[in-house]
Every structure is written in C-alpha cells, then in structure tokens.
Curated annotation (Swiss-Prot):
The protein, known as: Cancer/testis antigen 62
Organism: Homo sapiens
Domain of life: Eukaryota
Tissue specificity field: Testis specific. Expressed in cancer cell lines.
Region called Disordered, residue ranges: 1-22
C-alpha cells in the first residue's frame, strides 16, 4: 500500500495521463473520414493540432497520418507511392530514383509548408532547442 501511493506521488502527472491521451488521440482520429469535405477537414486539423501540441511533443505525427489519409493535400501520386515502392527505390541505390524520391519529398514539403506553415515552425524547434540549453 505504501509503495503504490509513494509511486503515484513521484510519477509526474503527464506520465499517469498517458493512456487517456492515447485514447483521446484515437477518438479524435476516428473523426477523420477519408475523402470528406476539405473545409471540414481543415477545421478538424487545426483543432486536432492544438490538442496534439498540448499532449505530445511534436504535432508532425498527426500531420503525417493526416497526409496519408488525405490525398487532396498532395497529388494522388504521392499517396499512391507506398512505402514498398520507396524501399525498392532506395534498395536499388539508383541515383536517378533517389533524385525522384527526394524531388517528390520536396514537393510534398512545399505543400505542407503552404498549407500548414505553423506546423513546420512548431516541429523544428522542440527537439533542437532544449538539448542545447541543457548541455550548457
């Protein structure tokens, strides 16, 4: 009895809340029906991103899932490229293929930065900033 209560006191609140955070994310993600109205999706993504920022370090995770679910944000060819196709291109180590992959990735990033500029800003900072501060 004593051990369990002391452990609960020691563990920070965000660790004890993790299961609820995960279930919340899954519940919110179920709201995305692939191929519904873009306007509704845009609203959902902003609300969802706000939730993710409060519960997870980087909202890019949500954006990645969102992009794979919604081909309208890129062009269809980006979504039709499965991870298998990508791994085949990389495993061949063909220079031309790797250029094609990086080109499509750059184009996808341009779409992301155009549609969600705030996402890229929030993602570039959290990982690099605190570590440099702690080392000093």
């Amino acid at each position: 009895m004593m051990h369990t209560t002391s452990y609960r006191r020691l563990s920070p609140p965000h660790l004890t809340d993790q299961p609820s955070a995960y279930s919340h994310t899954h519940r919110t993600f179920s709201h995305f029906s692939c191929g519904s109205q873009p306007a509704a999706q845009r609203l959902h993504v902003e609300l969802w991103n706000a939730d993710l920022q409060s519960e997870f370090l980087c909202p890019c995770l949500g954006l990645t899932l969102y992009l794979t679910c919604n081909p309208q944000l890129g062009k269809r060819k980006f979504c039709s490229h499965s991870s298998e196709d990508m791994s085949k291109m990389v495993s061949r180590r063909n220079v031309k293929d790797s250029h094609e992959v990086s080109g499509s990735l750059q184009a996808t990033l341009q779409v992301i930065s155009f549609s969600f500029p705030f996402l890229l800003h929030t993602c570039s900072h959290p990982l690099s900033h605190p570590t440099s501060g702690q080392r000093r």
